[in-house]
Protein backbone atom coordinates (compact mmCIF):
# COMPACT_ATOMS: atom_id res chain seq x y z
CA UNK A 1 0.00 0.00 0.00
CA UNK A 2 1.30 3.43 -0.89
CA UNK A 3 1.29 6.20 1.71
CA UNK A 4 1.39 9.97 1.37
CA UNK A 5 2.38 12.54 3.96
CA UNK A 6 -0.22 15.18 4.67
CA UNK A 7 2.31 17.99 4.99
CA UNK A 8 -0.26 20.80 4.90
CA UNK A 9 -2.16 19.40 7.84
CA UNK A 10 -1.51 18.92 11.52
CA UNK A 11 -3.01 16.12 13.53
CA UNK A 12 -3.79 16.14 17.23
CA UNK A 13 -4.97 13.14 19.21
CA UNK A 14 -7.34 13.61 22.13
CA UNK A 15 -7.56 10.49 24.27
CA UNK A 16 -8.65 9.41 27.72
CA UNK A 17 -11.86 8.48 29.50
CA UNK A 18 -13.14 12.07 29.43
CA UNK A 19 -12.10 12.89 25.83
CA UNK A 20 -15.63 12.74 24.37
CA UNK A 21 -17.20 14.95 27.06
CA UNK A 22 -14.24 17.37 26.95
CA UNK A 23 -14.44 17.88 23.18
CA UNK A 24 -18.24 18.09 23.27
CA UNK A 25 -17.95 20.98 25.75
CA UNK A 26 -15.22 22.76 23.75
CA UNK A 27 -16.28 22.37 20.11
CA UNK A 28 -19.14 23.64 17.97
CA UNK A 29 -20.39 20.24 16.82
CA UNK A 30 -22.15 17.40 18.66
CA UNK A 31 -19.26 15.13 19.60
CA UNK A 32 -21.34 13.11 22.10
CA UNK A 33 -23.10 11.29 19.25
CA UNK A 34 -20.13 10.91 16.89
CA UNK A 35 -19.78 7.17 16.23
CA UNK A 36 -16.37 5.47 15.96
CA UNK A 37 -14.83 5.65 12.48
CA UNK A 38 -17.00 8.67 11.62
CA UNK A 39 -15.97 12.28 11.21
CA UNK A 40 -17.48 15.74 11.58
CA UNK A 41 -16.43 19.29 10.88
CA UNK A 42 -16.12 21.39 14.02
CA UNK A 43 -14.85 24.73 15.20
CA UNK A 44 -13.28 25.92 18.41
CA UNK A 45 -14.28 29.42 19.50
CA UNK A 46 -13.06 31.94 22.03
CA UNK A 47 -15.23 33.01 24.96
CA UNK A 48 -16.37 35.92 22.77
CA UNK A 49 -17.51 33.52 20.05
CA UNK A 50 -14.67 34.19 17.61
CA UNK A 51 -13.48 31.17 15.65
CA UNK A 52 -9.97 30.18 16.76
CA UNK A 53 -9.64 27.04 14.64
CA UNK A 54 -11.70 24.75 12.46
CA UNK A 55 -10.91 21.11 11.93
CA UNK A 56 -12.08 17.66 11.00
CA UNK A 57 -12.84 15.54 14.09
CA UNK A 58 -12.36 11.82 13.50
CA UNK A 59 -13.70 9.42 16.13
CA UNK A 60 -11.88 6.17 16.86
CA UNK A 61 -12.15 3.54 19.59
CA UNK A 62 -9.04 5.03 21.25
CA UNK A 63 -10.29 8.63 21.21
CA UNK A 64 -10.36 11.39 18.62
CA UNK A 65 -8.10 12.87 15.96
CA UNK A 66 -8.31 16.54 15.05
CA UNK A 67 -7.05 17.39 11.57
CA UNK A 68 -6.29 21.08 11.16
CA UNK A 69 -3.90 23.47 9.45
CA UNK A 70 -0.34 22.49 10.33
CA UNK A 71 0.65 25.91 11.66
CA UNK A 72 -2.29 25.86 14.10
CA UNK A 73 -1.62 22.41 15.58
CA UNK A 74 0.88 23.41 18.27
CA UNK A 75 -0.92 26.57 19.48
CA UNK A 76 -4.30 24.79 19.54
CA UNK A 77 -2.85 21.84 21.48
CA UNK A 78 -1.27 24.20 24.00
CA UNK A 79 -4.37 26.33 24.45
CA UNK A 80 -6.81 23.39 24.55
CA UNK A 81 -4.56 21.87 27.20
CA UNK A 82 -5.24 24.88 29.42
CA UNK A 83 -8.89 23.80 29.65
CA UNK A 84 -8.29 20.16 30.58
CA UNK A 85 -8.11 20.92 34.33
CA UNK A 86 -9.14 17.72 36.17
CA UNK A 87 -10.53 15.91 33.14
CA UNK A 88 -8.78 12.66 32.26
CA UNK A 89 -7.71 13.78 28.79
CA UNK A 90 -4.40 13.70 26.94
CA UNK A 91 -3.74 15.94 23.94
CA UNK A 92 -0.79 14.94 21.75
CA UNK A 93 0.67 16.16 18.47
CA UNK A 94 0.62 13.26 15.99
CA UNK A 95 2.07 15.13 13.01
CA UNK A 96 5.13 12.89 12.62
CA UNK A 97 3.16 9.65 12.74
CA UNK A 98 0.26 10.33 10.37
CA UNK A 99 0.11 8.88 6.86
CA UNK A 100 -2.71 8.18 4.45
Which residues fall in each region the model found?
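Basic, glycine/lysine-rich polyanion-binding surfaces/domains
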Residues: 1-99
Amino acid sequence: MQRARLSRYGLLSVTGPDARAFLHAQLTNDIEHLAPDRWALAGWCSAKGRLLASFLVIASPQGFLLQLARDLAEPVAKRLGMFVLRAKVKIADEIGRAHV
